[in-house]
Amino acid sequence: RSIKLDKFSISDYKLDFGLQYTYKLNKKNTINVGAVYTLGHTLHGDAYKYHQTGTESNGSIYVQSQTGDTIPNPFKMPHTFGAGLTYVYDNRLTIGVDYTLQKWNTADLTWSKFNKESVEMNNRTKIAFGAEFVPSYISHNYLKRIRYRMGAYYSTPYNKVSYTDPDTGATSFQDGAREYGVSVGFGLPMFQSKSMLNISGQYIKVSPKFKGLMEENYLR
């Protein structure tokens, strides 16, 4: 009989920095440019690993061996960089694009090394696009004050998975599943109120690059 226990205790902080610049082309056209950075750092805390083996007889457990180890600061978060561009026309049409890069290939894998696990990581990238249109936010016609929204994104995986080629039997690390998503939504202004009811739907597809991984599709 074997018992394994992994326990983590993390207490840490997160620092985000950002800059934004707005340039007004003319009365109706505006461009916004922004950049963000999240500090990558080692998470403060401990991981505890416990393993016990024994035998069971007549309802009693007899311990044969037990080991326990504490690993300080076992995880590290990646540096994250982001940039975005937004175009606004007459406060009615907004179009934006964002790019994000997470430097997972420099993250510390102390916990995996301790477990003698072979792990490889990728830098994760994500590109997102979105748009919102309101025909007239001051119109008396309710339909013209509805905000119509749509968006899409594509992201690469940060993890690599162990893959065995079914033809050759060779084992190697390959990129994990890519992810795609599209969404649509509406912002419905409430009568006699400044509040708004937001309704949206999203389709997500998780697509592996090779056979052996499950393809996933979500609607939410």
Regions found by a protein language model. Name each.
Residues 1-220:
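Outer-membrane beta-barrel porins/channels
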